[in-house]
């Protein structure tokens, strides 16, 4: 058994968060929500370059290995996840709140063990093909290190086995020349960052900024142990009140709950991202970037990119089943709101951690090229009508692990500059 000793209340990260208090209730939630409604615009600063004080690590801005401001500039380098050794997470309260009831027996039986061998083998092959196609399109591909996620670990607050390194979008976000490691909210993902450390250290040595958000203890207080699981109606009511399975005990967030459009970054409060986590990001990125909270009619939000996926300057795919409550913000800014067609993934295909709407979880290679599932003909036709070339890849078995093309990747470098698309 892998045992890890850590200081209670400690933080693995380069940024400190003020201690808010041991009892966080409605007052804090309301304050945080009001705080987030808008942030002040600011002029560009040294974030836009890769310059560092140490001459040995001071490349010219054009040489920085990390540079990405949005979801659609020409893609030059990307991290693609791995399905190898992926494990079913233990069936804890935070996992239960983020999965469909029909799969609960699967988690109860298989938690702590590898996902079905044949399924993983197919998923590995699909992602290898995806990597080959990206390389053919001129994109540099990096992969996380293989890790055995079945190893048990223990902290002073919990013990668990791991999950996978399949979804770099969940743990990493690039903002300009900085790569940020998210703290995550599932106990099974506590050590997921280890798979990416060799890549990130390489970027750091070559001049990129590297930040790790404060690591949560993931103590019992972070989770609402009485969160109603069965009632969708109750979940709708609680979501409208900003209450989820994660509490405001300490900051937590998944990077996939943020989506970028130049100076403006949009975030949702979800089952894995709390208001304190978003506040940490807002303070950390200010004044160069503005972080806005948006919300959706979604009883079980987890990750924004299969609900609200920005595919170009002022162009967004908006999930018709999960309408955005703040859509007028984008309409007033002149954005084009596109409703993607209903996905056609079969009902009997296992989706252990996600919904069928992974069909809209696409990866833009640039404004005129998109990587889309080879089986999803309706959305292919939609893109073609928009004048966007579709690069068709089959990742149906990889979908079962909880992500589409956007989830399976983290765009490290796109050829572009910092701009504002909301003013």
From Swiss-Prot:
Q: Which residues bind arginine?
A: 170, 305, 322, 354-355
Its cellular-component GO annotations read:
extracellular exosome; mitochondrial inner membrane; mitochondrial intermembrane space; mitochondrion
User: Where are the N6-acetyllysine modifications?
Assistant: 385
Coiled-coil ranges (or none): none
As stated in the Swiss-Prot or TrEMBL entry, residues carrying the post-translational modification Phosphoserine are: 46, 49
Q: Which GO terms describe its biological process?
A: creatine biosynthetic process; creatine metabolic process; learning or memory; muscle atrophy; positive regulation of cold-induced thermogenesis
Question: Which keywords does this Swiss-Prot/TrEMBL entry list?
Answer: Acetylation, Cytoplasm, Disease variant, Membrane, Mitochondrion, Mitochondrion inner membrane, Phosphoprotein, Transferase, Transit peptide
**Can you tell me which residues form the catalytic site?**
254, 303, 407
Q: Which disease is it linked to?
A: Cerebral creatine deficiency syndrome 3: An autosomal recessive disorder characterized by developmental delay/regression, intellectual disability, severe disturbance of expressive and cognitive speech, and severe depletion of creatine/phosphocreatine in the brain. Most patients develop a myopathy characterized by muscle weakness and atrophy later in life. Fanconi renotubular syndrome 1: A form of Fanconi renotubular syndrome, a disease due to a generalized dysfunction of the proximal kidney tubule resulting in decreased solute and water reabsorption. Patients have polydipsia and polyuria with phosphaturia, glycosuria and aminoaciduria. They may develop hypophosphatemic rickets or osteomalacia, acidosis and a tendency toward dehydration. Some eventually develop renal insufficiency. FRTS1 inheritance is autosomal dominant.
What protein does this entry describe?
Glycine amidinotransferase, mitochondrial
Q: Which organism is it from?
A: Homo sapiens (Human)
